[in-house]
């Protein structure tokens, strides 16, 4: 259902480079060509098994915003039921950033909404607080809508310096 890689070349740009494809990674000639040329202190790779959204590069991970990379494995139970309410919690700028249909990208948007993107220094601690806040928002949405379908989130977020990973289940 696609794959993606994201990496940082901080000498040239603090924002990550991202390569996405709907082809299987083992069958992608472009990946075979660029992989030996990539050198990075921070590298994420994701193979997608679609649960929400069609197979497209737009729905492939890792998602990126500014200097952040995000990838997720799992699914948000009842996502279609809570999707509209989740979007109502987003500022216009974060809402407009969403390009795909996945529960993953929407959860990343909740994280970004919780993160202070107004120019203050972002630390590992503030990223962790934003992740906890996004999980709290998600739990609240699931409870408000009476969702009992299990949610499984295995999440990795990085800004190229700090890496956060969590496993969450309802």
Model regions: which residues?
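Conserved short alpha-helical segments that host acidic/polar catalytic motifs at enzyme active sites
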Residues: 1-72, 77-170
